[in-house]
């Protein structure tokens, strides 16, 4: 499994949508429980800026994984790597640098 080695810009968005199973009973009572062991996986919206010559390497890395194949990434200010996929990214090309915006979705397999 490959590792995403590029540094992302500070100020990324992190979204959590816990997966919850909910049952409603006839008298208005409801019961909730987490939907499995990994019910709170996160989605990271990241931005990074790389020199133009490095942009093709980064683009190739993302294309190689194709949105379905996971890779390892260490979120900023955390000490452990997590497995993520990236099914959505875009780039803005300027004179000397290319700015990428991507969405990393945490996975367990």
Curated annotation (Swiss-Prot):
**Where in the cell does this protein reside?**
Virion; Host cytoplasm
Fetch the InterPro entries from UniProt.
Answer: Phage_lambda_TipM
Q: Which domain of life is it from?
A: Viruses
User: Sorted alphabetically, which keywords does the UniProt record give?
Assistant: Host cytoplasm, Late protein, Viral genome ejection through host cell envelope, Viral long flexible tail ejection system, Viral penetration into host cytoplasm, Viral release from host cell, Viral tail assembly, Viral tail protein, Virion, Virus entry into host cell
**Gene Ontology annotations of biological process type:** symbiont genome ejection through host cell envelope, long flexible tail mechanism; viral tail assembly
A cellular component term from Gene Ontology for this protein is: host cell cytoplasm
Pfam families for the chain: Phage_min_tail
Family membership:
Belongs to the lambda-like tail tip protein M family.
Protein role: Part of the distal tail tip which plays a role in DNA ejection during entry, and in tail assembly initiation during exit. May bind tail tip complex associated with tape measure protein and allow tail tube protein polymerization on top of tail tip.
| Name of the protein | Tail tip protein M
Origin organism is Escherichia phage lambda
């Amino acid at each position: 499994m490959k590792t995403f080695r590029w540094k992302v810009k500070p100020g990324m968005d992190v979204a959590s949508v816990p997966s919850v199973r909910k049952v409603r009973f006839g008298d208005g009572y409801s019961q909730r429980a987490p939907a499995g062991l990994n019910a709170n996986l996160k989605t990271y919206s990241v931005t990074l800026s790389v020199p133009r010559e490095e942009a093709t390497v980064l683009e190739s890395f993302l294309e190689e994984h194709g949105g379905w194949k996971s890779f390892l990434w260490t979120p900023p200010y955390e000490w452990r790597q997590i497995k993520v996929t990236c099914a959505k990214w875009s780039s803005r090309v300027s004179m000397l640098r290319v700015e990428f915006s991507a969405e990393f979705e945490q996975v367990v397999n």
